[in-house]
Amino acid sequence: MSGSTRTGSASVLLVGLSFRSAPVTMLEQATVADADLPKMQLSLVDNDVISESLVLSTCNRMEFYTVANAFHSGLDHVVDTIAQFSGLQTAELEPHLYVHYADSAAEHMLKVASGLDSMVIGEQQIIGQLRSAYQSANETGTVGRTLHDLTQRALRTGKRVHSETAIDSAGASMVSFALDQALRYIEPARALSAVVDDAPLSQPLAGHRALIIGAGAMASLASTHLGKLGIDHVTVANRTLSRAENLVNHARQAGVDASAVPLDGVTDCLSAVDIVVSATGAVGNVVTEQDVRAAVGAAGGVASVAGRRGTKVMIDLSMPADIEHSVAEIDGVKLLNIEELTTMAGDRVQDESPARAIVADELQSFLEQQRAQSVVPTVKALRQKAGEVMAEELMALERLTPDMSEADRAAVVKSMKRVVDKLLHTPTVQAKKLSAGGQQVSYPDALAALFNLPNGMVDSVTQPGQADSSAAQTAGTSARADQIPSAARVGRVVREA
């Protein structure tokens, strides 16, 4: 295979670990903190096998993109590095790792950037995460031409998919699906007031309160959908309070009563809400079992703040988990995490075919670009060789024509350069076209294609009689050269022939 992502004998090697291949606990342990990414990327290239590295670390995947000149030794080094930084044993990791090489690695990054490989299909956050991963690796100095080109193509592909298809609605579908499931566990608040009693069926959350933890895309979708379901009040908690306040402002503009609190204010809010939606993407639990038990106790068992008894629903849309798994064991609490929701959603997914068509189109374009670039070093070497031959011929000319005027000499040099440029221009262009196409051709066909020889020209010089004459002339030239013992005179014969 003429791998498009190959540079000389090197190819892109991807080793990954994601929600599809590994349990949550392993993903959480393998996650690399932002502060450690530069050190890890440098460790990946600290050998003779790998020349480039980029680590993509998100809430539900760890992917290690490298450029390796040998597959097996490159793979061993990447796996050993993952084990070193995660503290996991190689034997523990290997069953859960996936590997892509050359063109397959390029295709995978394009799919990831498009949201096609995400737990929530179509989520846009991955584009920013990939951009940040590239910037980190670039600043560390571990990104070269190959990973630069691949990442830029992936970012372009992701933007096209989100602007040209309806895949974004898939993320909204997951949030709405999660809240639809939550409605199964929340008792209608019909007896609270005349206003609630008259609330339309389309607003089943009238009289209820919600807490949203996080202020990203998923949190924003949750706020919007809660408003449509008639929620009375939304509290938004986030590490950066200004982002929480921005989301609150959007909610208020949509007619939803809302307020913002810092992330450390979450525990104080738990007892006053019926629904919790968490989507921070943080490493480590934001809400613990102890927090929830205290909140349930403060609310009088499973009684809500409004005085009615019902289930407190906690929706965890993060990976790694924001909400401690053992919360599910608390009476009166229903925990819905992203893994469970994905399984329950089943076929409720957006049509991915338009997005996949864009990925295929961008991949093909990228492969052609990379194949065309792969011939550049050879073209440069060819031009360098031609320059050396021309220089030798000019030196020989100077020895043979010491009386030639400077004007004539300059004219000869200019003429020779023109001849070399004209001879090499067509094969340079054709070589890039042939490489981009990726088709296999015979040596004679390749030579004819490189020099763009007209159809029939090769046949015309190999007609019966002409071929014999050509062969005889070639043999004669070789014989004359063989008869000249001096190496210095060989060049003269070639010049005179």
Swiss-Prot record:
Gene3D superfamilies: Glutamyl-tRNA reductase, N-terminal domain, NAD(P)-binding Rossmann-like Domain
Keyword annotations of the record: NADP, Oxidoreductase, Porphyrin biosynthesis
Positions bound to NADP(+): G214, A215, G216, A217, M218, A219
Residue span of region Disordered: 461-486
Single GO MF descriptor: NADP binding
Catalytic residues (positions): C59
Domain-related comment: Possesses an unusual extended V-shaped dimeric structure with each monomer consisting of three distinct domains arranged along a curved 'spinal' alpha-helix. The N-terminal catalytic domain specifically recognizes the glutamate moiety of the substrate. The second domain is the NADPH-binding domain, and the third C-terminal domain is responsible for dimerization.
Subunit description: Homodimer.
Record family assignment: Belongs to the glutamyl-tRNA reductase family.
Protein name, entry field: Glutamyl-tRNA reductase
Naturally occurring in which organism (per UniProt): Corynebacterium jeikeium (strain K411)
